[in-house]
Amino acid sequence: MCAILQKAAQESGLKTKFYFEDKGEAARVAGSFVPCGKLLLLADEETADETLALKETFTDFRVYFAVQGKQESANGLFSLPDDVRAAVAVGGRSIAAARFFCTLRGACLVAIPARCSAAEIFCPRSEGGYPVNEPDAVLFDENFARGRAEGAAVAALSALYAEDIDIDGVFSGARKDAGYEMLRLSASLAVQVGAKVGRAPKESGRRRAGSGERLFESLCLQEIALMACPRLPSRAFYHLLSGKGAPLGECAFAALHYAQARYAALFENGRPRRYFVPDYAARARRAAEYVGEEAFANIKVPSAEECFAAAEIFEESRLHFAAAAEALGAYAEKIRRVYYAEGGKKPLFASGALEEAFSLAADLSPMLSVGALERDLGAVHMRGGAYGAKSGAKF
């Protein structure tokens, strides 16, 4: 188990134990929670064959094997006997379904990701909105899990999320919580995906984490951190892009590079217009289409004194944040190399889609972000509800 990740989980009140081993160890891990009895072995359609091959290793259990189809709900699992005491789920859909099943049945769950993703492991609710428990154990096999390009792009968003917290802290005075340090650590691990880490020398008696394991650790730390700070503007930006149906890796990659370019443009070249007043009501109505009446609480219309104070803080902090944006740009360039080296695809969005989503994201969070500062300070001319500035982002 990774000590850093395990400590972060425990400090966040999570019971999950993490194992970085071959998926063939699933029976042993499950047996450490429940020594025998009836067990559900659940697989996605894509992982069915490899999961079925594990069945013979569960010698101390009576195994019920099932496949979770793409359009199937978890309700079909409740036809299983009431005394199923454990479940092993392989793949994202299976993990989500098994979490719902095990929460209601009081069974323990071992989750085996089939992709470099942690979202389905820590999402607090099922698709139907029911609160679900986290898995008792997560077994990550880096030789089995796919999708490193997507995982690296999503993990790299931790750096962007941390910048959101930094900017809001300076302009609003908000304090940073434990999630901030986790995001910084997550970001540092994300760039190690392409590193040649391999195995430790045999004589050392230690096992060195592979780059896939570090990536998964980064993703888990990000998800744990977001439990403490879920309403980040950059996260809203990413979710708006992913809602357009593009692959998650492409959305994350585009969000990182576009937001960094807007960040740099604001603090390097932005000029506040002290008497500019945006149409807050129109923006709130637009945001309410996505989050309901909550949007009207997110957008706080500043007084003239608050606008002048924000403009002063902007000038005082300009050099600091311009340097931070430059550092984020260097980080994004490292992620670019990792992303394409792992087979990532170039993001393709319709004209204006990035500008529109970035503009709207500022109104979906109560935090003072780059987009919110552009809005409140009138630092960038607005056109048709979207910012008209050229991003300078390079994909």
Task: Kindly give the residue locations of the regions a language model identified.
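C-terminal charged capping/lid subdomain of soluble metabolic enzymes
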Residues: 1-4, 8-9, 267-395
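ATP/NTP phosphate-donor binding region
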Residues: 1-86, 386
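Generic secondary-structure signature for well-ordered alpha-helical cores
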Residues: 10, 140-147, 153-166, 188-206, ...
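Active-site segments that bind and position negatively charged phosphate/pyrophosphate groups
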Residues: 176-320
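Short beta-strand/turn micro-motifs composed of small residues
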Residues: 42-45, 89-91, 113, 140
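Short glycine/serine/threonine-rich phosphate/pyrophosphate-binding segments
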Residues: 49-51, 91-100, 118-121, 234-235
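Short hydrophobic/aromatic-enriched beta-strand-loop microsegments
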Residues: 60-65, 108-114, 248
